[in-house]
Amino acid sequence: MNHEELINSLTKKMNGALQVLDADLKGLRVGQASAYFLDPVQVEAYNSRVPILQVATISVSDTKTILVQVWDKSLVKAVKKAIMEANLGVSIISDDNQIIRLQLPIPSEERRKELVKIAHKYQEKSKIIVRNIRRDGIELIKQMEQNTECSKDEAHIYSKEIQELTDKYCDKIDKIIKLKEQDIINL
């Protein structure tokens, strides 16, 4: 693997860390209803636990209401139970046949602070992923140096580039979290 391939590979992996962060943050409800809000819900169906998206269609009717249309009428109770057990702080306001309406309350100040803490945990998790990618990249540079694929000076330059890439992605993570924090606080 040459220097350019290594940097491209590390960049791709670090972009993956940003995608994981984005997916994590979509699960944090801040002000508006989102179809992603129910992603963590697992339903007991057909003798196993499955994601809610495998048994229902989720849509948003307005900023505070999520509609869950269960495909199989026999699973409506299981879906309602799974939503309640997920402890997402939603109220089931009606269930017309196979459609369950969920009302999202405006988060209290305490809940917003809790959401900010959760966002910061996601931030740290993402930074750890990026730093582990950096560590792996630097290990590869050291191996290249030992195998005389690059000189000591080149290895130093490559390591510095990897560190700059790491700093760039850590800054991106910080900016994403700062924006999310502002969204949460300014509800």
Swiss-Prot record:
Pfam families: RRF. SUPFAM superfamilies: Ribosome recycling factor, RRF (SSF55194). Coiled coil: none annotated. GO terms for cellular component: cytosol. GO terms for biological process: cytoplasmic translational termination. GO terms for molecular function: ribosomal large subunit binding. Its main location: cytoplasm. Belongs to the RRF family. Responsible for the release of ribosomes from messenger RNA at the termination of protein biosynthesis. May increase the efficiency of translation by recycling ribosomes from one round of translation to another. This is Ribosome-recycling factor.
